[in-house]
């Protein structure tokens, strides 16, 4: 499974969300790719998926979560993604 987190630059809320997802992924031994919306790859994802809110967690190119979860919810989401 390929996990990507699309964030809006250095906004504090995006950085906090990045840290939450990185920790949840690290606990499960899953790699997380961080993509900034300003990058070419970020712009392509925005256009392709019609993303309008950030941050966004993608699993295998599909939107799974929008916004900032609490750490426990993030951990539960990663566990669910791994068993599905």
Summary of predicted features, one role per range:
Residues 1-27:
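Local sequence-structure signature of Cys/Sec-based thiol-disulfide redox active-site neighborhoods
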Residues 4, 36, 64:
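Short, flexible active-site loop motifs that bind/organize anionic cofactors or intermediates
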Residues 7-9, 30-42:
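Thiol-based oxidoreductase modules, predominantly thioredoxin-like and allied folds used
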Residues 15-19, 44, 69:
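Generic recognition of short, well-ordered alpha-helical segments
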Residues 23-27, 48, 83:
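Secondary-structure boundary motif
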Residues 49-57:
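Structural micro-motif
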Residues 59-84:
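Non-catalytic, surface beta->alpha helical segment in thiol-disulfide oxidoreductase systems
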């Amino acid at each position: 499974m390929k996990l990507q987190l699309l964030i809006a630059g250095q906004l504090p809320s995006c950085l906090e969300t990045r840290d939450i997802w990185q920790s949840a992924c690290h606990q499960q031994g899953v790699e997380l790719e961080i993509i900034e919306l300003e990058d070419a790859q970020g712009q392509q994802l925005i256009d392709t998926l019609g993303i309008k809110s950030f941050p966004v967690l993608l699993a295998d190119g599909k939107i799974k979560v929008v916004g900032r979860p609490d750490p426990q919810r993030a951990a539960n989401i990663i566990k669910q993604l791994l068993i599905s």
